[in-house]
Amino acid sequence: MQLFHGYIKNDRFHLHEHEINHCVRVLRKQVGDTIHFITGNGPLYQGHIQFASKQMVSGNFELIEERFGNFNYDLTVAIAPTKQMDRMEWFVEKAVEMGITRIIPILCDHSERRILKPGRLEKIALSATKQSLKGALVSISPLITFSEFIESRTSGYIAHCDLGIKQSFKDQIANQTGPITIMIGPEGDFSQKEIQWAVKKGIMPVDLGKSRLRTETAALVAVATLYQKHL
């Protein structure tokens, strides 16, 4: 199934500008053709093209599925962006394929990347959403500081490499219902101050297995653990 990204206005569907060229010039869609599209809010629609040009594709539509490709869980990953952007991009793509609700980039004491432009990540997320046949787009927040993130939290998990008592993330979520949030630190790990602050806020220290993982690998393991639970 070929999916397009569109929006609904005045009871008609319209394709976003970045989709028009592929629809009209590459796939040669024209008036009378039928396409499938998502708006990013969850549903799958079928659109019937009534107007097609290099500037606009629009028509009437019908709802096909209310929660298209959506999973029955809510997962937030708060992650320190990797120094190399291709690693962060890889994580976003794979996490979207397996099902993630939101990604919150956080700036930590040991962060190597301190500036993040979300535009490229949003494009990758959209492409992965369409490729993996999902109706809801992942939310990617602007980069915020560790303190800004932690102040609004009273529960969740923090995965770190420091010695000390930690629970298994897999075991902790085995019977958990409701939204899940996990924090993944930079290559240099969270600082002692950050770990202690998180614990004081009620965030549980967890491990993701015996291996020491790179940031993007650890984040994806967390996503895969929840994905596997719901298969």
Set out the residue ranges of the language-model regions:
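Short amphipathic alpha-helix with an adjacent loop that forms part of the alpha/beta core around
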Residues: 149-152, 169-175
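Short, acidic/turn-prone active-site loops that include or flank metal/cofactor-
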Residues: 164, 187-188, 210-213
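N-terminal positively charged helical leader segments and presequences
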Residues: 1-67, 119
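RNA substrate-binding interface of SAM-dependent RNA methyltransferases
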Residues: 68-157
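A C-terminal functional module that forms or caps the active site or interfaces directly
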Residues: 180-197
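Classical nucleotidyltransferase
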Residues: 159-166
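Structured adenosyl-cofactor binding patch, chiefly the S-adenosyl-L-methionine
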Residues: 192-231
